[in-house]
Amino acid sequence: MKEFKIAVIPGDGIGPDIVREAVKIMTKVGEKYDTKFNFVEVKAGGDAIDAYGEPLPKETIDVCKSSAAVLLGAVGGPKWDNLEGSKRPERALLGLRGALGLYANLRPAKVYNVLKSASPLKNEIIDEGVDLLVVRELIGGIYFGDRGTKEVNGVETAFDTEKYNVDEVKRIAHSAFKAAMKRRKKVTSVDKANVLDASRLWRKTVNEVSKEYPEVELSHLYVDNTAMQLVRKPSQFDVILTNNIFGDILSDEASMITGSIGMLASSSIREDSFGMYEPIHGSAPDIAGLDIANPLAQILSAAMLMEYSLDMSEAARDVEAAVEKVLNEGYRTADIYIEGTKKVGTSEMGNLVLERL
């Protein structure tokens, strides 16, 4: 029997409600695949502020570091809005990424056939299929480069610096190509190499890394063209590889194409496959504890965890298939409900997925 320690951070708002369902699903998967998951619950975000006076206690970092992966619910809420920046719940996410060395953000965007009416795009575009993954470099680039504000010739002037070295590009490129090997074996690297030196280094390095993955088809697009192509023909994309700032923008654009944010998972990973997995939606404190939140993004985050951190691809496919089956049978939580479908609560949705595993 395989055994894995999983750090669990329920967090704030609906976090505990949806994490509960994901843990339930993983436990069932463990029974099916002769695997034992040892879940260790720790605090971060507002939950940790209330308990310890800080958003990211040392105990949480230590437990995460000694685990195979981290399953996170959601952090934040208006209750803590008046705290200074460094003490706010959201600082826990930045702190965890830094402490755990998570440099690659993986954001899938998939339109389920039965939910395509939620997409803002025309049916003829969606009908071609949308199932892509944005791989974004997370801890380099312009967000972390030299910056400042100063007077130049008597005029207030601000600057930020886009900077990458070869090693930083190599490691994120490897993450993208490895992800593509699990998917349709196609990588689109996105840059602005017609203007930026940093992008020219990016493109040159990605080309070098691609030689190690002869099965994967590589293409390059400028970021402005990519933004256009995402709404014109999203079916052309499998894995999109890009830097921090471009990925920040493109991953949000891709998520909006689906029209159902409650369905979208994400992960932040590093070279050894360790990662932190969470839904992209917020903590929605107004519906916390009411059994109406959609747990599917959290359940799909657990599927990503099993695929990318535990090398349990078959189990991940099982979970994804169970989710799709429940949707095809017409079950919906309030956020994706339309007339003619069957509305269910958080716990019942989790049970429905469980039954179909």
From Swiss-Prot:
Similarity comment text for this entry: Belongs to the isocitrate and isopropylmalate dehydrogenases family. LeuB type 1 subfamily.
Pathway: Amino-acid biosynthesis; L-leucine biosynthesis; L-leucine from 3-methyl-2-oxobutanoate: step 3/4
Origin species: Clostridium pasteurianum
Important for catalysis, annotated site positions: 143, 192
Any one GO molecular-function label of the UniProt entry: 3-isopropylmalate dehydrogenase activity
Lineage of the organism: Bacteria, Bacillati, Bacillota, Clostridia, Eubacteriales
Protein name, entry field: 3-isopropylmalate dehydrogenase
Disulfide partners: none
The entry's keywords: Amino-acid biosynthesis, Branched-chain amino acid biosynthesis, Cytoplasm, Leucine biosynthesis, Magnesium, Manganese, Metal-binding, NAD, Oxidoreductase
